[in-house]
């Protein structure tokens, strides 16, 4: 009878530790792009909704990821990621 191979992959850190590190990185990035009062309000809303639970941690991670993604996609001034605005030719011609 065949047996599954022994796990020979790299040692992984515990999920909880990885999740908290991800949250910390997202918070540091969010502070660079959004007013602290907005982030504080978001944190308060999550805390009031979920309390001090892992579900709350996951909710704030999702929210910060979505906010940062949209922020970069719209065109953050600090990022090369995002929608590039086409400059119109000075002679008034259009490429449409």
UniProtKB/Swiss-Prot annotation:
Subcellular locations according to the entry: Virion; Host nucleus; Host extracellular space
GO cellular component terms, A-Z: host cell; host cell nucleus; host extracellular space; virion component
PTM section of the record: Phosphorylated on several residues by host. These phosphorylations regulate VPR activity for the nuclear import of the HIV-1 pre-integration complex.
Region (Homooligomerization): 1-42
Organism superkingdom: Viruses
Example GO biological process: symbiont-mediated arrest of host cell cycle during G2/M transition
Alphabetic keyword roster: Activator, AIDS, Apoptosis, Cell cycle, Host G2/M cell cycle arrest by virus, Host nucleus, Host-virus interaction, Ion channel, Ion transport, Modulation of host cell cycle by virus, Phosphoprotein, Transcription, Transcription regulation, Transport, Viral penetration into host nucleus, Virion, Virus entry into host cell
Main location: virion
Modified-residue entries (Phosphoserine), positions: 79, 94, 96
Miscellaneous note of the record: HIV-1 lineages are divided in three main groups, M (for Major), O (for Outlier), and N (for New, or Non-M, Non-O). The vast majority of strains found worldwide belong to the group M. Group O seems to be endemic to and largely confined to Cameroon and neighboring countries in West Central Africa, where these viruses represent a small minority of HIV-1 strains. The group N is represented by a limited number of isolates from Cameroonian persons. The group M is further subdivided in 9 clades or subtypes (A to D, F to H, J and K).
Protein family according to the UniProt entry: Belongs to the HIV-1 VPR protein family.
Physiological role: During virus replication, may deplete host UNG protein, and incude G2-M cell cycle arrest. Acts by targeting specific host proteins for degradation by the 26S proteasome, through association with the cellular CUL4A-DDB1 E3 ligase complex by direct interaction with host VPRPB/DCAF-1. Cell cycle arrest reportedly occurs within hours of infection and is not blocked by antiviral agents, suggesting that it is initiated by the VPR carried into the virion. Additionally, VPR induces apoptosis in a cell cycle dependent manner suggesting that these two effects are mechanistically linked. During virus entry, plays a role in the transport of the viral pre-integration (PIC) complex to the host nucleus. This function is crucial for viral infection of non-dividing macrophages. May act directly at the nuclear pore complex, by binding nucleoporins phenylalanine-glycine (FG)-repeat regions.
Assembly and binders: Homooligomer, may form homodimer. Interacts with p6-gag region of the Pr55 Gag precursor protein through a (Leu-X-X)4 motif near the C-terminus of the P6gag protein. Interacts with host UNG. May interact with host RAD23A/HHR23A. Interacts with host VPRBP/DCAF1, leading to hijack the CUL4A-RBX1-DDB1-DCAF1/VPRBP complex, mediating ubiquitination of host proteins such as TERT and ZGPAT and arrest of the cell cycle in G2 phase.
Protein name: Protein Vpr
Gene: vpr
